[in-house]
């Protein structure tokens, strides 16, 4: 039989053990490590609003933030976008909130590129974050931290704020139209715990304009001539297509033309697209007449996710061209007595081209100004005429070749010139040489006659 009071002693021992075990469990829970700075281990779905700061107990004094954007915010490169966030209470004296724009991990970035049709070889050439964005943060007593890391922007929030909405406005840089990537806008306190976040996708941009640098089409050029249309600023370029039409509704390929497209990527990441309508044949397509028109249609389709940014869907640019269909200019040189050479270049552009003379391989300058006249009334083509004085030379010498060259078309035609050869033999030496030749011939005839007469007299006397 147990001594009296032993039951009470066992109850006391049991109570002490329960208290000891309960204290150990509480201590273990309190010693759990806090979340790593800047990393949210248990992040909510985007756009769900406020989030409890990890490592803290639920309390009415807990600082939370709710951003109006939430979820994924799509925006256009070159345009501003804003995140407006409201704090649940004013931060305490020992609390500081920072707004940080941080890029996604590299593996996530690579995965995000593919759905938007980005170019793989641009992956390693992304512009640094500091050159992509220009920050304009409007907040009560907000200050821009110049020592912010290159991976993001840190903005200190005034500790005296009373919960009024705080706006963060970011402007993307126009010079990086083709930048690839997604970024997450985060709000976190000094301890690195995330309060709320929103994902921002800056990829899509419709073409700014479609323009044709020139509407001159040289049909029988020595190099393949082409009409060019440029569309600037469209991104991603894989969603931009173009088509050529002859006289409104006939495809260029069926009319005997070839087409080509080229993406021009500059050093700062811009992507411009050029389309070419090319005549690859030696002769002009039979369907071309002076009145033939060319229509170019560029269509840009917004990538998936940008439907709200571009509610009208596809963006279409139409360019109607009325080309000046040009044939190869003709250069002719002729002699005009008594001492002039005339060079005439026909079927040339009225504001383009000059004539250059050379004799025996050396450039000579004409004292006469070239004259331009239209081929016919209302024509857009002209004829260019220039006169060159040739000196009279009474001496006997070798022939000289005069060449008249049409300059200004070297990129289109290998050589445009006309030549004439002046033979300086006696018959082409001019009037003095003809007189001399007549005297010589007269003396020869007279001498021959005298020789015959003398021979006859001597023969008769014998």
Swiss-Prot record:
Side of membrane Cytoplasmic, spans: 455-462
Compositionally biased tracts (Low complexity): 29-38
Keyword Glycoprotein: yes
Signal peptide: 1-23
InterPro entries attached to this UniProt entry: GA_GC (IPR001038)
Pfam family, one: Marek_A
Superkingdom of the source species: Viruses
Chain segments annotated as transmembrane: 434-454
Keywords: Glycoprotein, Membrane, Signal, Transmembrane, Transmembrane helix, Virion
Record's subcellular location: Virion membrane
Spans within the Virion surface topological domain: 24-433
Location, primary (coarse class): virion
Region (Disordered): 29-57
GO cellular component, one term: virion membrane
Protein family per UniProt: Belongs to the herpesviridae glycoprotein C family.
Protein name (record): Envelope glycoprotein C
Organism: Psittacid herpesvirus 1 (isolate Amazon parrot/-/97-0001/1997) (PsHV-1)
Lineage of the organism: Viruses, Duplodnaviria, Heunggongvirae, Peploviricota, Herviviricetes
